Amino acid sequence: MKFSNETIGVLKNFATINPSIVFKPGSTVRTISPQKTVMAAATISETVDVQAGVYDLSRLLATLSLFENPEVDFGDDKFTIKGGRSEVKYTYTSESLIVSPPDKDIVVPDPEATVNVTWADIDSVIRATGVLQLPEVAFSSDGSTIKLSAVDSKTSTADKYEVVVAEGVSTEPFNMIIKTDNLKLMPTDYEVTLSSKGMAHFKSDV
């Protein structure tokens, strides 16, 4: 098979969440951070036939970049990567060495609200955390307006940057804090489901 540019982009993003991955049969790839605080899943255009563990995903992606439009074969115990007259044998890693997520869809318990957020708004808040040196982002609601903010929840006098992402809604008031380091997102718009159980689910059709 040949990995599409979209799949390569997904895998590069996954490598920022967990340096390792287990490919499983089918067209869904999943990952989870070593601390088990961030979980992600994506449907790719390719279909994987066998289970394959990769300890260093960034290394695999760098290996693929050695070729122009490489062919990737999932063997019994290794990848065979071919391009032109060149070839690499890349051995799988034991899954016992990899923190991998459960084989089930992400379900948000007791959601408080669902809001559509543009990448422009997400990106502006993430950039604000860097400029203002703030460690977190927050989704908050006063009951009718939902805001996305760059914050420091532990310092009452800290600066704050915020953008309104939804108006005229009806929710219970809430304030959900997310560590900026946990926002491992692709640059696209998202439907965000927020739960008082401490979970935010970012879903995109891209």
Please identify what each model-predicted range represents.
Residues 97-115:
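Long, charge-dense
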Residues 1-93, 111-206:
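DNA polymerase processivity clamps
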